[in-house]
């Protein structure tokens, strides 16, 4: 075919004109491009031949056109017709007229949206579907901006109580207000609370609460709680006698009543009474449940000749010495030596307990 074209004189004339103008029909493949690239890398530059640059520019400037499909130009469908109700049938058979009318009715709404999401008008380069989506987004953004402006204005009214006309005065809500009249400077009028007034009340209350919290913190800092526990007064001394004192004398009396810290860590009167009870339980001549007993375990002695605790007739007639004059039985009898040894061992054990408690108290004071 190329030979046949060359035989035509008109074709040869057009070809000569194009060659003389320098417009050559350029066609490159990957092999030609690689060879041109290698020539540039090796330093062999052909400044006269710029066909490669023009080819690259033409490739980059080529824009792919948007071509809609053929279905975008019509609303017909090739799907078979299925009757959806008994009214579309005539005596149980398919009526061709009803079929065509139903297809025509279903085609009308499709014609209205022909090219809705396919056609892009010249100069807009967007489909109708894309334009509608942009409009909906713009409406949503405008609504959000209006809401933010309203919220900011509302906050500014809350922060500035002067907008409500209440400076330095707290206005109660309308429900809590009594039928009173206040002078606002413009005349004697009754104040009625509005939503803005209630917001101003909340702002003033929050400021007052913050001031009260600062004052309470200052009071807590100025008050020394440790000083409350530095001076401990013995309750027994207060009950025995209270000496009224004023000025320096009263301070000296209070200082005398201060109990040292060592006494606080020592065994209490309850522990001493228990020790006394344990010690007196082993005495043969004392009753451990006797409240009037002043025996502290230091000068106690076993007296077998006389027992002053029992002064009744039965006690006088009974000979207590006869119990200890007998020899100890095989199953174990309490002799004076055994009682004294037991008493001494108990006293030593109690003193060791006191020392242990004092040692622990010293350790605790050292840790504190």
Swiss-Prot record:
Region (Disordered): 140-167, 286-336
Protein name: Anaphase-promoting complex subunit MND2
Organism, scientific name: Saccharomyces cerevisiae (strain ATCC 204508 / S288c) (Baker's yeast)
Subunit text: The APC/C is composed of at least 13 subunits that stay tightly associated throughout the cell cycle: APC1, APC2, APC4, APC5, APC9, APC11, CDC16, CDC23, CDC26, CDC27, DOC1, MND2 and SWM1. MND2 interacts directly with APC1, APC5 and CDC23.
Matches recorded under InterPro entries: APC_su15/mnd2, Mnd2
Alphabetical keyword list: Cell cycle, Cell division, Mitosis, Phosphoprotein, Ubl conjugation pathway
Entry function: Component of the anaphase promoting complex/cyclosome (APC/C), a cell cycle-regulated E3 ubiquitin-protein ligase complex that controls progression through mitosis and the G1 phase of the cell cycle. The APC/C is thought to confer substrate specificity and, in the presence of ubiquitin-conjugating E2 enzymes, it catalyzes the formation of protein-ubiquitin conjugates that are subsequently degraded by the 26S proteasome.
Pathway in which this enzyme or protein is active: Protein modification; protein ubiquitination
One GO biological process term: mitotic sister chromatid segregation
GO MF terms, alphabetically ordered: ubiquitin ligase inhibitor activity
Modified residues (Phosphoserine): 293
Claim: Phosphoprotein is one of the keywords in the record: yes
Biased composition, class Basic and acidic residues, residue ranges: 149-162
Pfam families in UniProt: Apc15p
Family label: Belongs to the APC15 family.
Domain of life: Eukaryota
Gene Ontology CC annotations of this record: anaphase-promoting complex; nucleus
């Amino acid at each position: 075919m190329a030979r046949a074209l060359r035989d035509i004189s008109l074709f040869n004339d057009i070809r000569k004109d194009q060659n003389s103008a320098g417009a050559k029909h350029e066609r490159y493949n990957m092999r030609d491009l690689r060879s041109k690239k290698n020539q540039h890398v090796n330093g062999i530059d052909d400044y006269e031949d710029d066909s490669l640059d023009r080819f690259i520019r033409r490739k980059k400037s080529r824009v792919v056109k948007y071509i809609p499909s053929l279905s975008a130009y019509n609303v017909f469908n090739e799907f078979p017709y299925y009757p959806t109700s008994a009214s579309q049938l005539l005596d149980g058979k398919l009526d061709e007229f009803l079929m065509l009318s139903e297809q025509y009715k279903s085609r009308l709404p499709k014609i209205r949206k022909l090219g809705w999401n396919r056609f892009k008008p010249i100069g807009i380069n967007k489909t109708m579907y894309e334009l509608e989506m942009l409009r909906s987004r713009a409406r949503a953004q405008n609504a959000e901006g209006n809401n933010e402006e309203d919220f900011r204005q509302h906050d500014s009214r809350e922060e500035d109580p002067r907008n409500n006309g209440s400076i330095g005065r707290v206005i109660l809500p309308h429900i809590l207000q009594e039928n009173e009249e206040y002078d606002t400077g413009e005349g004697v009028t009754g104040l009625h609370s509005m939503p803005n007034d209630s917001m101003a009340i909340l702002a003033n209350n929050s400021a007052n609460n913050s001031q009260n919290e600062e004052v309470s913190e200052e009071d807590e800092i100025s008050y020394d709680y440790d000083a409350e526990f530095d001076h401990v007064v013995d309750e027994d001394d207060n009950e025995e006698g209270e000496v009224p004192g004023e000025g320096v004398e009263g301070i000296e009396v209070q200082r005398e009543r201060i109990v040292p810290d060592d006494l606080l860590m020592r065994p209490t009167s309850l522990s001493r009474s228990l020790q006394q009870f344990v010690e007196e339980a082993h005495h043969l001549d004392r009753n451990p449940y006797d409240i009037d007993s002043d025996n502290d375990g230091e000068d106690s002695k076993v007296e077998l000749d006389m027992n002053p605790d029992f002064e009744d007739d039965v006690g006088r007639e009974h000979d207590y010495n006869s119990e200890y004059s007998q020899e100890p039985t095989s199953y174990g009898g309490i002799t004076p030596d055994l009682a004294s040894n037991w008493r001494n061992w108990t006293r030593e054990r109690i003193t060791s307990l006191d020392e242990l408690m004092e040692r622990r108290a010293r350790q605790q004071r050292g840790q504190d």
